[in-house]
């Protein structure tokens, strides 16, 4: 694309994929979306002074006279490459985390561990941009133009480490194509986003793109082997002999060996990088302990001492909305908030709550509208099976009837209202 721009001697001052925000001299990318085709807005972009229009190579539409049109084989990848070429950054170390559950927690723990190690770090993900304090479009993985601008600003602040959540949508849509990460990590894969990916196989393949298109020759790869689809993951990655990931919990040098609770303190033994480490936590569910040690393992792959990092475990704050303790009821019951939006995450939250508390567990939850409907009855069954009491409420119904969503969640489940 850059070669064609040079060949056609196109003078431009930026790129845009949104005709509403395009400025005179921008190159407009007419991206075909799931619901809206960007080619519908080409005339609007031209009227606003677009320097050129980029369309998919298969497009056979006619365009207004005197319009410079460039055809791209993969329009999304072309947009990302050009955006990152325009907004260059010099962040030294980049870490990407993908997975159904645990991305935000691992990113949070990585940021915490890097900061206590005296390193400057920025995180981009579900909770927004930790440095710029924004999440303009409420996306885990921002669109390429926005992301490239964010990274440039982060770089200008002399920040050396980037920790980024890589969503399946972001990977499938090539939102950060052109970036190469020093560490690529996978937390787990379970049922989610099938409204978009249609099948679990498509979903897994989207996650695996991180280990194919976003690595350089010295990249470190790590995967938590305690995931339901580990055999499928291994079979996909085996096809590329240059990809040799480390499997956390299946590798004798990277695993948790013991968790013991004494006086409300969890004492944990683990091995990271062949070093035996001891950690202490207070009111941490087991899956968060696993995420914390997974984060230590990631940093060990790029030279950090796990023994030094492990000393900070007891003082680590809980992650916002991840089995986060928020207070007590009038009768003394402890209240935890967890952003469990998948069947596996809901099960983990309830099971871990029972480990932390001796009393009954009452779960209050809901499912979002206009999203994966298949998981609704699954979550209802899980709540019914594992909680002592379950109540279904509304959780951003969007354009769906809230009562219909609640009915689908409850399904044939018992002890749930």
Give residue spans per PLM region.
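N-terminal leader/targeting and accessory segments in enzymes
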Residues: 1-81, 85, 228, 278-280, ...
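Nucleotide phosphate-binding/pyrophosphate-handling subdomain across enzymes
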Residues: 21, 264, 273-389, 411, ...
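Well-ordered beta-strand positions
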Residues: 27, 52, 183, 220, ...
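Generic hydrophobic/aromatic pocket-lining and core-packing "Φ" positions
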Residues: 42, 111, 151, 207, ...
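Beta-strand->loop->alpha-helix junctions that form or flank phosphate-binding loops
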Residues: 53-57, 237-262, 280-286, 310-315, ...
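C-terminal helical cap/extension that packs against the catalytic core
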Residues: 53-63, 334, 377-417
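Active-site regions of enzymes building and remodeling cell-envelope glycoconjugates
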Residues: 64-73, 135-138, 240-246, 257, ...
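Phosphate-binding loop of NTP-binding sites
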Residues: 77-225, 229-242, 296-299, 356-357
């Amino acid at each position: 694309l850059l070669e064609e721009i040079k060949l056609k001697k196109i003078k431009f001052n930026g790129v845009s994929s949104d005709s509403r925000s395009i400025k005179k001299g921008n190159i407009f990318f007419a991206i075909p979306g799931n619901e809206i085709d960007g080619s519908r807005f080409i005339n609007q972009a031209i009227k606003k002074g677009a320097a050129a229009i980029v369309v998919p190579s298969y497009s056979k539409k006619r365009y207004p006279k005197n319009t410079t049109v460039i055809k791209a084989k993969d329009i999304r990848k072309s947009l990302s490459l050009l955006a990152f070429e325009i907004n260059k950054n010099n962040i030294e170390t980049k870490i990407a985390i993908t997975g159904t559950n645990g991305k935000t927690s691992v990113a949070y723990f990585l940021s915490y561990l890097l900061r206590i190690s005296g390193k400057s770090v920025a995180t981009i993900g579900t909770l927004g941009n930790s440095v710029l304090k924004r999440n303009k479009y409420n996306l885990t993985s921002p669109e390429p133009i926005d992301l490239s601008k964010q990274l440039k600003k982060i770089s200008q602040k002399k920040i050396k480490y980037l920790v980024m959540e890589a969503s399946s949508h972001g990977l499938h849509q090539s939102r950060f194509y052109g970036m190469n990460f020093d560490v690529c990590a996978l937390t787990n894969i379970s049922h989610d986003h099938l409204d978009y990916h249609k099948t679990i196989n498509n979903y897994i393949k989207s996650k695996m793109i991180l280990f194919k298109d976003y690595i350089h020759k010295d990249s470190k790869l790590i995967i938590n082997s305690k995931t339901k689809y580990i055999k499928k993951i291994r079979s996909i990655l085996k096809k590329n002999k240059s990809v040799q990931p480390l499997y956390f919990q299946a590798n004798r040098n990277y695993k948790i060996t013991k968790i013991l609770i004494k006086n409300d303190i969890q004492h944990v033994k683990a091995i990271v990088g062949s070093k035996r480490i001891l950690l202490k936590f207070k009111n941490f569910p087991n899956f968060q302990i696993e995420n914390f040690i997974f984060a230590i393992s990631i940093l060990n792959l790029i030279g950090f001492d796990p023994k030094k990092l492990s000393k900070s475990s007891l003082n680590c704050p809980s992650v916002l909305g991840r089995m986060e303790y928020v207070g007590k009821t009038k009768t003394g019951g402890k209240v935890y908030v967890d952003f469990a939006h998948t069947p596996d995450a809901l099960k983990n939250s309830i099971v871990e709550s029972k480990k932390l508390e001796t009393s009954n567990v009452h779960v209050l939850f809901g499912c979002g509208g206009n999203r994966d409907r298949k998981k609704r009855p699954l979550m209802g069954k899980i709540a019914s099976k594992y909680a002592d009491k379950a109540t279904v409420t509304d959780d951003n119904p969007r354009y769906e009837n809230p009562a219909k969503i609640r009915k689908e969640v409850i399904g044939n489940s018992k002890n749930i209202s």
